[in-house]
Protein backbone atom coordinates (compact mmCIF):
# COMPACT_ATOMS: atom_id res chain seq x y z
CA UNK A 1 0.00 0.00 0.00
CA UNK A 2 2.81 2.38 0.93
CA UNK A 3 4.70 1.73 -2.32
CA UNK A 4 1.48 2.22 -4.26
CA UNK A 5 1.00 5.70 -2.83
CA UNK A 6 4.65 6.58 -3.38
CA UNK A 7 4.69 5.75 -7.10
CA UNK A 8 2.59 8.76 -8.24
CA UNK A 9 4.77 11.05 -6.11
CA UNK A 10 7.96 9.64 -7.64
CA UNK A 11 6.54 9.95 -11.14
CA UNK A 12 5.56 13.56 -10.46
CA UNK A 13 9.06 14.31 -9.12
CA UNK A 14 10.66 12.80 -12.22
CA UNK A 15 8.37 14.85 -14.47
CA UNK A 16 9.27 18.03 -12.56
CA UNK A 17 13.03 17.33 -12.78
CA UNK A 18 12.79 16.58 -16.51
CA UNK A 19 10.69 19.70 -17.02
CA UNK A 20 13.15 21.93 -15.18
CA UNK A 21 16.04 20.41 -17.16
CA UNK A 22 14.17 20.96 -20.44
CA UNK A 23 13.46 24.60 -19.57
CA UNK A 24 17.13 25.07 -18.67
CA UNK A 25 18.17 23.67 -22.05
CA UNK A 26 15.81 26.05 -23.81
CA UNK A 27 17.24 29.09 -22.03
CA UNK A 28 20.90 28.00 -21.89
CA UNK A 29 23.14 30.23 -24.00
CA UNK A 30 26.56 29.23 -22.68
CA UNK A 31 29.72 28.92 -24.76
CA UNK A 32 33.29 28.41 -23.58
CA UNK A 33 36.24 30.71 -24.23
CA UNK A 34 37.55 30.16 -27.76
CA UNK A 35 34.23 28.80 -29.02
CA UNK A 36 31.91 30.65 -31.36
CA UNK A 37 28.97 32.66 -30.08
CA UNK A 38 25.88 30.68 -29.11
CA UNK A 39 23.90 30.26 -32.34
CA UNK A 40 20.71 31.70 -30.84
CA UNK A 41 22.55 34.75 -29.56
CA UNK A 42 24.08 35.29 -32.97
CA UNK A 43 20.78 34.92 -34.82
CA UNK A 44 18.86 37.18 -32.44
CA UNK A 45 21.43 39.81 -31.50
CA UNK A 46 24.47 39.38 -33.75
CA UNK A 47 28.09 39.00 -32.67
CA UNK A 48 28.81 40.36 -29.16
CA UNK A 49 31.43 43.06 -28.71
CA UNK A 50 33.24 40.77 -26.26
CA UNK A 51 32.67 37.80 -23.95
CA UNK A 52 33.62 37.32 -20.30
CA UNK A 53 33.57 34.18 -18.14
CA UNK A 54 33.25 33.23 -14.47
CA UNK A 55 33.88 29.89 -12.76
CA UNK A 56 33.49 28.59 -9.20
CA UNK A 57 33.07 25.14 -7.60
CA UNK A 58 29.37 24.32 -7.28
CA UNK A 59 29.23 23.75 -3.50
CA UNK A 60 32.18 25.90 -2.48
CA UNK A 61 31.95 28.31 0.47
CA UNK A 62 34.68 30.37 -1.20
CA UNK A 63 33.06 33.59 -2.39
CA UNK A 64 35.91 35.03 -4.45
CA UNK A 65 35.27 35.07 -8.20
CA UNK A 66 37.63 35.70 -11.10
CA UNK A 67 36.12 37.13 -14.28
CA UNK A 68 38.23 36.22 -17.32
CA UNK A 69 38.31 37.17 -21.00
CA UNK A 70 38.47 34.96 -24.11
CA UNK A 71 42.19 34.35 -23.48
CA UNK A 72 41.69 33.33 -19.82
CA UNK A 73 43.20 36.58 -18.57
CA UNK A 74 41.68 37.83 -15.30
CA UNK A 75 40.01 41.19 -15.97
CA UNK A 76 37.96 41.51 -12.75
CA UNK A 77 38.20 39.99 -9.30
CA UNK A 78 35.38 39.79 -6.76
CA UNK A 79 36.27 39.34 -3.09
CA UNK A 80 33.89 39.07 -0.13
CA UNK A 81 34.46 39.50 3.59
CA UNK A 82 33.98 36.09 5.20
CA UNK A 83 32.92 37.46 8.60
CA UNK A 84 30.58 40.30 7.75
CA UNK A 85 26.89 40.71 8.59
CA UNK A 86 26.36 42.60 5.34
CA UNK A 87 28.32 40.15 3.13
CA UNK A 88 30.26 43.07 1.71
CA UNK A 89 31.76 42.33 -1.71
CA UNK A 90 34.27 44.41 -3.67
CA UNK A 91 34.93 44.07 -7.41
CA UNK A 92 38.29 45.30 -8.70
CA UNK A 93 39.78 45.48 -12.19
CA UNK A 94 43.14 44.15 -13.42
CA UNK A 95 44.89 47.22 -11.98
CA UNK A 96 43.27 46.62 -8.57
CA UNK A 97 40.98 49.64 -8.91
CA UNK A 98 37.55 49.30 -7.30
CA UNK A 99 34.79 49.22 -9.93
CA UNK A 100 31.84 48.21 -7.74
CA UNK A 101 30.78 47.47 -4.17
CA UNK A 102 27.95 45.15 -3.12
CA UNK A 103 26.37 45.08 0.33
CA UNK A 104 23.50 43.01 1.73
CA UNK A 105 20.81 44.82 3.70
CA UNK A 106 20.60 43.71 7.32
CA UNK A 107 17.37 42.09 8.58
CA UNK A 108 15.71 41.89 5.15
CA UNK A 109 13.14 39.20 4.34
CA UNK A 110 13.86 39.60 0.63
CA UNK A 111 17.67 39.43 0.88
CA UNK A 112 18.13 42.88 -0.65
CA UNK A 113 21.58 43.67 -2.02
CA UNK A 114 22.74 47.22 -2.69
CA UNK A 115 25.13 47.69 -5.62
CA UNK A 116 27.22 50.83 -6.13
CA UNK A 117 29.17 51.01 -9.41
CA UNK A 118 32.01 53.52 -9.65
CA UNK A 119 30.83 56.25 -11.98
CA UNK A 120 27.44 56.88 -10.42
CA UNK A 121 25.13 53.87 -10.92
CA UNK A 122 23.44 52.62 -7.74
CA UNK A 123 20.66 50.03 -7.59
CA UNK A 124 19.42 46.99 -5.68
CA UNK A 125 18.61 43.34 -6.34
CA UNK A 126 16.57 41.00 -4.15
CA UNK A 127 15.64 37.32 -3.97
CA UNK A 128 12.23 38.24 -5.43
CA UNK A 129 14.10 37.82 -8.70
CA UNK A 130 14.11 34.05 -8.18
CA UNK A 131 10.36 33.47 -7.98
CA UNK A 132 9.86 30.45 -10.21
CA UNK A 133 6.86 31.79 -12.15
CA UNK A 134 8.54 35.07 -13.12
CA UNK A 135 10.63 35.24 -16.29
CA UNK A 136 11.05 39.02 -16.24
CA UNK A 137 12.47 41.40 -13.64
CA UNK A 138 13.02 45.16 -13.83
CA UNK A 139 15.82 47.01 -12.06
CA UNK A 140 13.85 50.17 -11.35
CA UNK A 141 16.83 52.42 -10.63
CA UNK A 142 18.37 51.63 -14.03
CA UNK A 143 15.26 51.03 -16.08
CA UNK A 144 16.86 47.76 -17.20
CA UNK A 145 15.01 44.47 -17.65
CA UNK A 146 16.26 40.94 -17.07
CA UNK A 147 14.36 38.25 -18.95
CA UNK A 148 14.91 34.49 -18.82
CA UNK A 149 15.61 31.67 -16.36
CA UNK A 150 16.98 33.36 -13.23
CA UNK A 151 17.24 30.18 -11.13
CA UNK A 152 20.01 29.00 -13.47
CA UNK A 153 21.22 32.48 -14.50
CA UNK A 154 20.35 32.16 -18.18
CA UNK A 155 18.94 35.55 -19.10
CA UNK A 156 19.04 38.53 -21.44
CA UNK A 157 19.59 42.05 -20.11
CA UNK A 158 17.87 44.96 -21.88
CA UNK A 159 18.23 48.71 -21.35
CA UNK A 160 15.32 51.15 -21.05
CA UNK A 161 15.14 51.38 -24.85
CA UNK A 162 14.80 47.58 -25.11
CA UNK A 163 18.25 47.22 -26.63
CA UNK A 164 20.30 44.21 -25.59
CA UNK A 165 23.10 45.00 -23.18
CA UNK A 166 24.26 41.45 -22.44
CA UNK A 167 23.29 37.78 -22.57
CA UNK A 168 24.28 35.56 -19.62
CA UNK A 169 24.42 31.77 -19.90
CA UNK A 170 25.23 28.99 -17.42
CA UNK A 171 26.97 25.75 -18.38
CA UNK A 172 24.84 22.72 -17.51
CA UNK A 173 26.15 19.43 -16.09
CA UNK A 174 29.34 20.85 -14.62
CA UNK A 175 31.02 20.48 -11.21
CA UNK A 176 31.59 24.23 -11.33
CA UNK A 177 29.30 27.21 -11.59
CA UNK A 178 30.37 28.41 -15.03
CA UNK A 179 28.87 31.47 -16.69
CA UNK A 180 29.43 33.23 -19.98
CA UNK A 181 28.64 36.93 -20.36
CA UNK A 182 28.20 38.07 -23.96
CA UNK A 183 28.47 41.86 -23.91
CA UNK A 184 26.72 43.92 -26.57
CA UNK A 185 27.28 47.27 -24.86
CA UNK A 186 30.83 47.50 -23.49
CA UNK A 187 30.05 50.87 -21.90
CA UNK A 188 27.96 48.98 -19.33
CA UNK A 189 30.55 46.27 -18.69
CA UNK A 190 31.22 47.05 -15.02
CA UNK A 191 27.50 47.23 -14.20
CA UNK A 192 26.80 43.92 -15.94
CA UNK A 193 29.69 42.23 -14.10
CA UNK A 194 28.36 43.60 -10.79
CA UNK A 195 24.89 42.19 -11.55
CA UNK A 196 26.23 38.73 -12.42
CA UNK A 197 28.51 38.58 -9.35
CA UNK A 198 25.63 39.63 -7.08
CA UNK A 199 23.30 36.99 -8.53
CA UNK A 200 25.99 34.30 -8.25
CA UNK A 201 26.49 35.13 -4.57
CA UNK A 202 22.73 35.12 -3.96
CA UNK A 203 22.37 31.71 -5.63
CA UNK A 204 25.24 30.31 -3.56
CA UNK A 205 23.62 31.62 -0.36
CA UNK A 206 20.31 29.96 -1.34
CA UNK A 207 22.04 26.61 -1.89
CA UNK A 208 23.82 26.74 1.45
CA UNK A 209 20.70 27.79 3.35
CA UNK A 210 18.70 24.90 1.88
CA UNK A 211 21.39 22.25 2.43
Listing of model-derived features with the role each one plays in the protein:
Residues 1-5:
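Short, strongly hydrophobic alpha-helical membrane anchors
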Residues 7-88, 94-97, 106, 110-112, ...:
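Low-complexity or membrane-interfacial segments used for flexible interactions
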